[in-house]
């Protein structure tokens, strides 16, 4: 990082984020994304995920500041003439690899997407989903009955995955969480921790009577018949965090929250 980094400021449409961006641009200037050294994202976790999806391929480190309802992936926003440049110089990086999802639908079309938090399959109607679970080409569960199932990254393991009673994964552990959502059968199965290079394939066993949708972060595809998930080997993003509250510490602390 250069001594005076060029910053591209991005803000969610929320009024506090827009106002904060205006103040920061006046103080530090603003650069186009392709000219910037760092991206500063102002908003909540939803906007951070949107920023990573839209601009992750640009390979720019992202420093987020919380101006939204949820900010697990963000640093605190401070507007008391805080020296942002000093914070950026001290910031610690966290490297994240997204999940790659490939979907086949009932109509025969295929689609793909990335997920930095999780890929989740959910029943579309009142009827439970019936799914099979294959890992690296081997069927591990012939029939999973329940509301659905998900695969979560370490960064996403504290979100939907944790609410579904999945494990919290340490950052840098090179693991994924495979977590059922309200499982009925097998009733005692509570999920698994997988190596990050595991290929996970879900098949919908009765897609006409029991339709299923899949969501990669916020991108939903309905009426799926097969979903394949693996960690990306090509895409990697870097988030920057204040050293006193870095992402690794946040994930660790979540395990002791009461």
Swiss-Prot record:
Q: What class of enzyme is it?
A: transferase
Against InterPro entries, the record matches this protein to: ATP-NAD_kinase_N (IPR017438), ATP-NAD_kinase_PpnK-typ_C (IPR017437), NAD/diacylglycerol_kinase_sf (IPR016064), NADK (IPR002504)
Q: Which cofactor does it need?
A: a divalent metal cation
Record keywords, A-Z: ATP-binding, Cytoplasm, Kinase, NAD, NADP, Nucleotide-binding, Transferase
> What Gene3D superfamilies does the record point to?
Probable inorganic polyphosphate/atp-NAD kinase, domain 1, Probable inorganic polyphosphate/atp-NAD kinase, domain 2
Q: Which reaction does it catalyse?
A: NAD(+) + ATP = ADP + NADP(+) + H(+)
Q: Does the keyword Oxidoreductase apply?
A: no
Superkingdom as given in the UniProt entry: Bacteria
The primary site where this protein sits is cytoplasm
Q: Which residues bind NAD(+)?
A: 45-46, 117-118, 147, 155, 158-163, 182
In which compartments does the protein localize?
Cytoplasm
List the GO biological process terms.
NAD metabolic process; NADP biosynthetic process
| GO molecular function terms noted in the UniProt entry | ATP binding; metal ion binding; NAD binding; NAD+ kinase activity
Q: Which residues form the active site?
A: 45
EC number(s) on file:
2.7.1.23
Gene Ontology annotations for the cellular component aspect, listed alphabetically: cytoplasm
Keyword NAD among UniProt keywords: yes
Please state which protein family the record places this protein in.
Belongs to the NAD kinase family.
The job of this chain, per UniProt, is described as: Involved in the regulation of the intracellular balance of NAD and NADP, and is a key enzyme in the biosynthesis of NADP. Catalyzes specifically the phosphorylation on 2'-hydroxyl of the adenosine moiety of NAD to yield NADP.
Protein name listed in UniProt: NAD kinase
Question: From which organism does this entry originate?
Answer: Xanthomonas campestris pv. campestris (strain ATCC 33913 / DSM 3586 / NCPPB 528 / LMG 568 / P 25)
